UniProtKB/Swiss-Prot annotation:
<dbReference type="GO" id="GO:0042802">
    <property type="term" value="F:identical protein binding"/>
</dbReference>
<dbReference type="GO" id="GO:0009743">
    <property type="term" value="P:response to carbohydrate"/>
</dbReference>
<dbReference type="GO" id="GO:0006108">
    <property type="term" value="P:malate metabolic process"/>
</dbReference>
<dbReference type="GO" id="GO:0043531">
    <property type="term" value="F:ADP binding"/>
</dbReference>
<dbReference type="GO" id="GO:0005739">
    <property type="term" value="C:mitochondrion"/>
</dbReference>
<keyword id="KW-0521">NADP</keyword>
<feature type="site" description="Important for activity">
    <location>
        <position position="269"/>
    </location>
</feature>
<dbReference type="InterPro" id="IPR015884">
    <property type="entry name" value="Malic_enzyme_CS"/>
</dbReference>
<comment type="function">
    <text>Catalyzes the oxidative decarboxylation of (S)-malate in the presence of NADP(+) and divalent metal ions, and decarboxylation of oxaloacetate.</text>
</comment>
<dbReference type="GO" id="GO:0006734">
    <property type="term" value="P:NADH metabolic process"/>
</dbReference>
<feature type="modified residue" description="N-acetylmethionine">
    <location>
        <position position="1"/>
    </location>
</feature>
<feature type="binding site">
    <location>
        <position position="408"/>
    </location>
    <ligand>
        <name>NADP(+)</name>
    </ligand>
</feature>
<keyword id="KW-0560">Oxidoreductase</keyword>
<dbReference type="Pfam" id="PF03949">
    <property type="entry name" value="Malic_M"/>
</dbReference>
<feature type="binding site">
    <location>
        <position position="269"/>
    </location>
    <ligand>
        <name>a divalent metal cation</name>
    </ligand>
</feature>
<dbReference type="InterPro" id="IPR001891">
    <property type="entry name" value="Malic_OxRdtase"/>
</dbReference>
<dbReference type="Pfam" id="PF00390">
    <property type="entry name" value="malic"/>
</dbReference>
């Protein structure tokens, strides 16, 4: 089959400025005709490269660098210079590059963001812009925005309050919207809402790029968020997707519950994490050969991630036929004060739902011995929380214990894959939030740890939601997504210890998630894009961003020769 002809794209830009436009720049892939017509001939070396050669050049530079942070800077500079090449590089080996553009390296990048800030990659909206947020949105050069990732920087990964430095998270997240889900990067907008910071180091740092003040809270904060949501929806439409990211626990659930029925919004820390964790559990059940309702699940952590997973597990149990009250009893949570039980002081409304009749306990090892869970899920960002004794006990209670160490970055993981596999003698069904290398057991068997990365979830969800114009994102979408992800795990993957499809298939996974969301949306009459496409897969695929270069030339074409005949005589 012959390759498709490049898409023709017209621009009024010419000369040097065109080579500085990352949406149009092709570096040495410009043809001679393009260079001459666009007035950039002479600005580039007299060499003509294919995109494959350009990728090779980037990879060579990437591999010569000694630290992941330097590799991150290399890729961010490429994103600023040549957008299509940046995404071609990412998609050429997503397993290799994802840990650089997102977790775990993005955590270090956020800590250093004030030091390495180069140029705007998103909007910085501050509390002092109240009453004028609509005007600030007008500063962004793109008129069509279909997806926004927004944070206030208060709980960046497991690193805490990084204030304005948290901008690295929306930027990295939206890069994965495109690399993993095919969203058009020009239709994506990273946003930081700067309301101050409680981080003393940042407040004293002369290089800090954010507001030097304590965080604004209460009604002033809420009014600010209300104005932001209204301004975004007014400018970009009610079906502009707004993803909340890395908000503090105290705000995350509250804001999700406040906005979920008014706007097209979701919280990835709550719902995305829940979906990928439940996907891992569903895949694990194919190894344990039993049902979700046969499990007793213990969480180390009771923040937004833990509660989000717990709520989605309850939904999955209800779908399996278990009444909600019985489903809740299958789930136990441990927070910083110990086991969450009825009558314990200072329980939030969300935690109260999962409080059971039991004596108070504080020590995690003792709690594991008491509850005897079949599945242990860590989401508290306490590195090493799953001690050797806990792992031994899990293996003693269960033939195939399910152990998920989901905290990010790697330094916050509850245990490593090697510790888990070796202490349980390879019987554990393990997944982690950050990537771990394969582990070879004494018997020669090599196990590949499953990475429960939210990137399996949010790109496909965003692609599906945007494609059919959904105006609300329900929890059922995330349960459906979990089921789709689990279905993509083959028996061979399970034998290798993988609970998730290989990352290099993530675009295909996103396509299947989006296709299912689109099918359900039209069936449930919640889609707003009409007429309804007959072939849903082809429809979604047509929405996906191509990393192939466009042909940037004027639209030239021929007329019939007889029409073009030059008149040489005046008719008498």
């Amino acid at each position: 089959m012959e390759p498709e002809a490049p898409r023709r794209r017209h621009t009024h830009q010419r000369g040097y400025l065109l080579t500085r436009n990352p949406h149009l720049n092709k570096d040495l892939a410009f043809t001679l005709e393009e260079r001459q017509q666009l007035n950039i001939h002479g600005l580039l070396p007299p060499s003509f490269n294919s995109q494959e050669i350009q990728v090779l050049r980037v990879v060579k530079n990437f591999e010569h660098l000694n630290s992941d942070f330097d590799r991150y800077l290399l890729l961010m500079d490429l994103q600023d210079r040549n957008e299509k090449l940046f995404y071609r590089v990412l998609t050429s080996d997503i397993e290799k590059f994802m840990p650089i553009v997102y977790t775990p390296t993005v955590g270090l990048a956020c800590q250093q963001y004030s030091l390495v800030f180069r140029k705007p990659r998103g909007l910085f909206i501050t509390i002092h812009d109240r009453g004028h947020i609509a005007s600030v949105l007008n500063a962004w050069p793109e008129d069509v925005i279909k997806a926004i990732v927004v944070t206030d920087g208060e709980r960046i990964l497991g690193l805490g309050d990084l204030g304005c430095n948290g901008m690295g998270i929306p930027v990295g997240k939206l890069a994965l919207y495109t690399a993993c889900g095919g969203m058009n990067p020009q239709e994506c907008l990273p946003v930081i809402l700067d309301v101050g910071t409680e981080n003393e180091e940042l407040l004293k740092d002369p290089l800090y790029i954010g507001l030097r003040q304590r965080r604004v809270r209460g009604s002033e904060y809420d009014d600010f968020l209300d104005e932001f949501m209204e301004a975004v929806s007014s400018k970009y439409g009610m079906n502009c997707l707004i993803q909340f990211e890395d908000f503090a626990n105290v705000n995350a659930f509250r804001l999700l519950n406040k906005y979920r029925n008014q706007y097209c919004t979701f919280n990835d820390d709550i719902q995305g994490t829940a979906s990928v964790a439940v996907a891992g559990l569903l895949a694990a059940l194919r190894i344990t050969k039993n049902k979700l309702s046969d499990q007793t699940i213990l969480f180390q952590g009771a923040g937004e991630a833990a509660l989000g997973i717990a709520h989605l597990i309850v939904m999955a149990l209800e779908k399996e036929g278990l009444p909600k009250e019985k489903a809740i009893k299958k789930i136990w949570l441990v927070d910083s004060k110990g086991l969450i039980v009825k009558g314990r002081a200072s329980l939030t409304q969300e935690k109260e739902k999962f409080a059971h009749e039991h004596e108070e306990m504080k020590n995690l090892e003792a709690i594991v011995q008491e509850i005897k869970p079949t599945a242990l899920i860590g989401v508290a960002a306490i590195g090493g929380a799953f001690s050797e004794q806990i792992l031994k006990d899990m293996a003693a209670f269960n033939e195939r214990p399910i152990i998920f160490a989901l905290s990010n970055p790697t330094s916050k993981a509850e245990c490593s894959a090697e510790q888990c596999y070796k202490i349980t003698k390879g019987r554990a069904i393990f997944a982690s939030g950050s990537p771990f290398d394969p582990v070879t057991l004494p018997n020669g068997q090599t196990l590949y740890p499953g990475q429960g990365n939210n990137s399996y979830v949010f790109p496909g969800v965003a692609l599906g939601v945007v494609a059919c114009g959904l105006r609300q994102i329900t929890d059922n979408i995330f349960l459906t997504t979990a089921e789709v992800i689990a279905q993509q795990v083959s028996d061979k993957h399970l034998e290798e210890g993988r609970l998730y499809p290989p990352l290099n298939t993530i675009r295909d996974v996103s396509l299947k998630i989006a296709e299912k969301i689109v099918k359900d949306a039209y069936q449930e009459k919640t889609a707003t894009v009409y007429p309804e496409p007959q072939n849903k897969e082809a429809f979604v695929r047509s929405q996906m961003y191509s990393t192939d270069y466009d042909q940037i030339l004027p639209d030239c074409y021929s007329w019939p020769e007889e029409v073009q005949k030059i008149q040489t005589k005046v008719d008498q």
